Amino acid sequence: MSWRTSLCIGFVAMFMMACEPHVQPPTPPAPTANVPTFPGAQGGGMYATGGRGGLVYHVTSLSDDPNDSGSLRYILKTPGKKIVVFDVSGVIQLKRQLDITEGAVTIAGQTAPGDGICIAGHPVVIKASNVIIRFVRFRMGDEAGEEGDALTCTEKRDVMIDHCSFSWSTDECVSCYGNTNFTMQYCIVSESLRNSTHGKGRHGYGGIWGGKNATFHHNLLAHHDSRNPRFDHSYVDNKCFGPIDYVNNVVYNWGGNSTYGGEGAGQPRLINMVNNYYKPGPATSSSKKTRLLDPTVSCSSCSKLGTFFPGKFYLNGNHMHGSETVTNDNWKGSTVQTDEVKSLTPWTEGLTLMTQTQTAQEAYTTTLDKAGCSLVRDDVDKRIVDEVRNATYTYTGSNGSTKGLIDSQKDVGGWPQYNSTTPPTDTDKDGMPDEWETANGLNPNNVWDGKEYTLSQEYTNVEVYLNSLVQHLY
C-alpha cells in the first residue's frame, strides 16, 4: 500500500468519525433495590420501577387513534420500557376499552399543561406488571351502554396507582385485587352509577380491593351504594390471601353497605383495617350509620373453589363519625364479632409496612386536602371534597337514586372542560423542560441526560423533575 493510499484511508476514517452521530455512553445505573418509586410512595407497590431508565414518549394528541403516534393508545402499545409525559390537557374520549399490555411503564399525568388529563368513555384495564400511574382522572360514564369499571387491575405485580381520580363507572369505580406488591394511594373514588347500564341491575359500587402485600391508604370513597370497598373474595380470586393493609382511608355516604367481604377458599384472607375515617351521609340508612365492617361468613358460590373461610381482620384506631362507641371499640361496628373473624395483632409477615401513618382524624384532613388528581383539582373533585366536609350532597339520580347517589354522569353535568396551555419548551424531548435543565446544570440539547443520575443517587434526572412537580402533595 502506497503512502498516498494510506493517507487517503486515514482522512476517510477521520471524516466518518466526525460525521457519526454522537452517542452518549451509558451511565451505570444507580441501585434500584429498596428505592421507593418516588418520594412519598408507601406500601406494597412502593418499589415498582415502572419506566425508570426507559425512553420518554410525549402525548401530543387527545385522539384515541391507534395509528396516531402522539396518542396515548399508540404510545401504550409500543413495546419497551417507557415514561409517558403529556404536552396537552383535556378529555381523551376512548372509542373502546384501553388495555395497558406493556409493562415497565410510568404514566406521569402531572406533566399535562393546564388542567390535566381525563380518560372517559370506556374502561381502562391494566394487563401488565410493573406499572406506575400518577395524576390521571378516569371518569368512564355510561354513553357506551356497557358495564365496567373505570380502572381494573387484577393478578399483576408491582403496581403503583397514585393521586388519581375515579368516577361514573357502571360496575365498580376501581377494582384492584389478586395483585402482588400493590399500592393505591391518595386517590378519590366517587359517584359510581347506581341505576345505570349494568346487566344485573342496580349497582353503584366503590370497588373490590385486595391482593398479597397490597396497600390502600389515604383514599377517599364517596357516594357509593356499597363495596366501600369489598375485600378480595374467592369468587374473583383464589390466589392472594393477603396481607391487605387498609390504612388512613376516608369513607363517606355509603348506602346499602360500607366495607365488607374478605372471605377465602382454602384459607382465610388476612386484612388490617387501621386508622380509617368513616362518615355516614344523607344516603346512609339509620341502621347502617355505625357500620364499619360486614365480614362475609357464608358464601353460596365458594364450595366449588375450596373450603370456605371468613377473613381474619385486625381492627384498630378507626373513627366512626357520630359514634363514640364504635370509635372506642371498633368491633362494635362489625356485624360479626366472633373469634373466627378477629385478629388481636396486626398482620405483618410478608407485608411492606407503611413508613408513615396518621391517626384517623389526621388522615381525614390529609386525604381531603391532597387526594385525587390534585395538582389541579377539577370541579368534580372540588365538589366531592366539599360535600364530605359539610356532610351533604348536591345531586340526585335521574333513575330513582337519591341523596348523593347518582345514575348517570349527566345527573351532575357530565365531564368538565379541561383547559390546556402551551407546554414548556423541551428541545431534546427528554421529558425535562429546557429552563429546568439549565437551572439544574443539565444540557437541554442532550437527549440522554434524563436517564442519568446526576441530580440524585436514587432517581434518574427525569424522575427528579417529575417528582419535583408534585412533592408538596405528600
Role assignments for model-derived ranges:
Residues 36-84, 449:
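Acidic Gly/Asp/Thr-rich repetitive segments characteristic of extracellular carbohydrate-active
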Residues 6-16:
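Bacterial N-terminal signal peptides
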Residues 71-80, 92-108, 117-134, 140-157, ...:
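Extracellular beta-strand-rich solenoid/capping regions of secreted or surface-exposed proteins
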Residues 230, 235, 240-409:
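Extracellular beta-rich repeat passengers
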Residues 104, 109, 129-140, 155-168, ...:
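Right-handed parallel beta-helix
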